[in-house]
Amino acid sequence: MDYKEAGVDVEAGRNFVEKIKKKVESTHRPEVLGGLGGFGGFFQIPSGYQEPVLVSGTDGVGTKLKLAQGLNCHHTVGIDLVAMCVNDVLTSGAQPLFFLDYLATGQLNPQQLAEVVEGIVEGCHLSHCALLGGETAEMPGFYGVGEYDLAGFCVGIVEKSLLLDGSQVQIGDAVIGLASSGVHSNGFSLVRKIVETQGLSWDFCPDILEGKSLGEVLLTPTQIYVKPILEALSSNLKIHGMAHITGGGLPENLPRCLQANQSVQINPNSWEILPIFTWLAQAGQVSPSAMFNTFNMGIGFVVIVPVDQAETTLNWFNNKGIKAYQMGEVIEGTGHLVGLDF
């Protein structure tokens, strides 16, 4: 008996690495030293920093993977994986430098996993982030046929004096929401439960989605905000704080960029609620409170700016093709979002 008979095909693993090698290397920045295949990846710290601070983040895609696997559509979740990590790192004002991925599967399917990696590569290009390395683990008996799981890891850099940690946020600051591209990568256990309870398939096209299927809309990749945010930070805009709206929605994530004595007064009618959220709420009879505490509800990223820069900030992002909304202001409090009391 050998390893292949036990379910692990080492040769297929080597062939897979060769298959993706050129695409991975297409993401490499000048700071990348060496190529794939070593025990570690090497990245030279960029020049021009007086007191560089490294910022790290890690995340996954959650049960959205079940949808991708069910529809045999694997490219977009690779983009999701990068987005979830780089957007987190971005909230500190950091520029993403490099990314690593961990991919585990029951049986190596080179075509399937190549699609995933192609998505990761695209996400890295969108965030100007080098795919420095990764791990592909074949684990027979642990995952079912066609199943895989993903984890991502990102490291970014920011000048220490420019680090955003919430301390700059002031009472009276304006809260600007940047539109999400859809459900992004959180809340899919509830999404799947709603669709299952309704006895629907992912091919179902609700009228409110105007001809698009549930699967098509739900697999829309998470918006990557790196380029517009880094450009904003390099402009004359003064950004005091930022938040990535992920699991737990606005109520859980927005307070993470505030000081202990601050809250936000939110106007929930100030931005567009995407049709997919309206459908989920109606089909699943989900309360407004549960919706806002589970999903991003159309706001994927938040920037906090001085109130006298609110209009300039709105115009700046809208001109960049990112829908922006003035959705509230920072007030005295203890982190509770006033206005979302459903």
Swiss-Prot record:
- Per its UniProt entry, which superkingdom is the organism in? Bacteria
Q: Which organism is it from?
A: Gloeothece citriformis (strain PCC 7424)
Q: What is the designated name of this protein?
A: Phosphoribosylformylglycinamidine cyclo-ligase
One Gene Ontology cellular component term attached to this UniProt record is:
cytosol
Question: Which pathway does it serve?
Answer: Purine metabolism; IMP biosynthesis via de novo pathway; 5-amino-1-(5-phospho-D-ribosyl)imidazole from N(2)-formyl-N(1)-(5-phospho-D-ribosyl)glycinamide: step 2/2
- Please give the SUPFAM superfamilies that the UniProt record associates with this protein: PurM C-terminal domain-like, PurM N-terminal domain-like
Protein family according to the UniProt entry: Belongs to the AIR synthase family.
Task: Note whether ATP-binding occurs among the keywords.
Answer: yes
Q: One of this protein's GO BP terms?
A: 'de novo' IMP biosynthetic process
List the catalytic activities from the record.
Answer: 2-formamido-N(1)-(5-O-phospho-beta-D-ribosyl)acetamidine + ATP = 5-amino-1-(5-phospho-beta-D-ribosyl)imidazole + ADP + phosphate + H(+)
